[in-house]
């Protein structure tokens, strides 16, 4: 009979440790104020905008500083949330860090010179700058 209670205690201890490990392995959510939601906060709209525009797992309205209700997005802490304000779905992405967008795929025309003048029509070199 005593051996049975030792086995029961050992199984119970293993079970408790396993439950603790499952909770630790679960993803933890990080809260961040929405960058795209404005106006009176509505939970359904906040949730939808956080998921679709900010790639969050969830969104909800909460009162924080000064009693104002704001939309908060919840991200998986193991992944980093988007840094910049995302573009709406279907919009063209912003230019690369260099500042100017890449030329069109079909060739297109070269970008204008940095000094603001227009490029020569024949494709030759531009005239020298004036001295006056």
Curated annotation (Swiss-Prot):
One of its GO terms (molecular function) is molecular function activator activity. Post-translational modifications do not seem to influence T-cell recognition. Thus, recombinant non-glycosylated Art v 1 could be a starting template for engineering hypoallergenic vaccines for weed-pollen therapy. Optimization of codon usage is required for effective genetic immunization against Art v 1 and should be considered in the development of vaccines for the treatment of allergy. Residues 81-132 are annotated as: Disordered. This is Major pollen allergen Art v 1. Changing residue 73 to S: Loss of IgE reactivity. Contains several extensin-like repeats in the C-terminal section. Pfam families: Gamma-thionin. Disulfide bonds join 30-77, 41-61, 46-71, 50-73. The mature protein extracted from the plant exhibits an average rate of 76% of hydroxyprolines. O-glycosylated. O-linkage of 3 galactoses plus 9-16 or 21-23 arabinose residues attached on one or two hydroxyprolines. GO terms for biological process: defense response.
């Amino acid at each position: 009979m005593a051996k049975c209670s030792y086995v029961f205690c050992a199984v119970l201890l293993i079970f408790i440790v396993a439950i603790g490990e499952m909770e630790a392995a679960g993803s933890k959510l990080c809260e961040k104020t929405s960058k795209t939601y404005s106006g009176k906060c509505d939970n359904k709209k906040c949730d939808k905008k956080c998921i679709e525009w900010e790639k969050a797992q969830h969104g909800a309205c909460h009162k924080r500083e000064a009693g104002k209700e704001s939309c908060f997005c919840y991200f998986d802490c193991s992944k980093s949330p988007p840094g910049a304000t995302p573009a709406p779905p279907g919009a063209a992405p912003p230019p690369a860090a260099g500042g100017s967008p890449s030329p069109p795929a079909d060739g297109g025309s070269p970008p204008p010179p940095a000094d603001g003048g227009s490029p020569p029509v024949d494709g030759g070199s531009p005239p020298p700058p004036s001295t006056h």
